[in-house]
A protein has these predicted regions:
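Bacterial Sec-dependent N-terminal signal peptides
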Residues: 1-27
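N-terminal "domain-start" segment that seeds a small globular fold
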Residues: 20-46
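Generic structural signal for well-ordered beta-strand positions
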Residues: 45-48, 144
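Conserved redox-active cysteine motifs that mediate thiol-disulfide chemistry
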Residues: 51-74
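Hydrophobic beta-strand anchors of alpha/beta hydrolase catalytic cores
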Residues: 56-57, 85, 134
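Structural microenvironment flanking redox-active thiols in thiol-disulfide oxidoreductases
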Residues: 66-104, 118-122
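Short, internal strand/loop/helix patches
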Residues: 98, 102-139
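Thiol-/selenol-based redox modules, centered on thioredoxin-like
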Residues: 130-159
Length: 159
């Protein structure tokens, strides 16, 4: 009887402990976008403060030319539509990143570096293996599209 009590106590401990160790939800279509805060020279950005608005969150890397092309295309579309655009570079070389933002004539106020101390969990929360990934987040904070094309963005967001 005593061994059953110990076994039962161990089972309850494992059950309740494992429920506390769940990983953040994967950033995929239909899931709630992991919230974060990040800053740049223009100020702070908090995803939780964007409720009620469409947000296009783009991660890019200097090592991936296509992500740089996507970044420029997303920026031009966001400027002409009802989308709040946020671009996060995941490279460690912030000097080169700053130069590329200037060369590509990107709106610096929408450009962020993942090297910011507040943003260290963003890469993990969004399960980024590469820098070329973008998320369209709806006004309720739900991910509607991953790596959307420009046509998809136009169809999914109000103009």
């Amino acid at each position: 009887m005593k061994s059953w009590s110990i076994l039962l106590a161990a089972a309850f401990t494992i059950f309740f402990t494992s429920s506390q160790l769940t990983e953040p939800s994967e950033a995929k279509i239909g899931s709630t976008a992991p919230v974060f805060s990040i800053k740049n020279e223009s100020g702070d950005f908090s995803l939780s403060e964007m409720r009620g608005k469409y947000v296009l969150l783009s991660f890019w890397s200097l090592n991936e030319p296509q992500s740089r092309v996507n970044n420029a295309q997303y920026a031009s579309l966001a400027d002409s539509n009802n989308i709040h655009y946020v671009s996060i570079n995941i490279d460690s070389d912030t000097t080169l990143w700053s130069q590329i933002v200037e060369i590509d004539n990107l709106n610096a106020s929408r450009q962020y570096s993942s090297q910011d101390s507040k943003s260290s969990d963003i890469i993990d929360d969004y399960h980024l293996a590469t820098g070329s990934r973008a998320y369209l987040i709806n006004p309720d904070g739900i991910i509607e599209a991953v790596n959307p094309s420009l046509d998809q963005l136009v169809k999914l967001t109000p103009i």
